Every structure is written in C-alpha cells, then in structure tokens.
C-alpha cells in the first residue's frame, strides 16, 4: 500500500482518515469502526464491502 495514497483518500462514509492494517490488508476508519478490504492492492472503498469492527480492532 502506497502511503502517499493514504494521505489523499478518505473514508467514504465520514470523510475521515483511514489507517492501513498490513496484516489484514484492510483500511480502517476508526471513527466509524469500519474496515475496507484491499483486493489485489486496490482499496475497495464501498460501504457495502466494508465490515464492522470492534473498538478494540480499530485501536490496533
């Protein structure tokens, strides 16, 4: 994941900052507790594709 990309993309739900979870290959929105998948290195920033995460998961 190119960290320059993280500087310009935002959560499609709240427009907040996204955090990269390399282990799970997901982009995390800590405000909405959502995890957006990466497929073949491409972020899938669709609310319908996101999974809900616990507050503990969003802290890591």
UniProtKB/Swiss-Prot annotation:
Domain of life: Bacteria
SUPFAM superfamilies: Trm112p-like
GO cellular component, one term: cytosol
HAMAP family per UniProt: UPF0434
Similarity comment text for this entry: Belongs to the UPF0434 family.
Protein name: UPF0434 protein CKO_02153
Organism listed in the record: Citrobacter koseri (strain ATCC BAA-895 / CDC 4225-83 / SGSC4696)
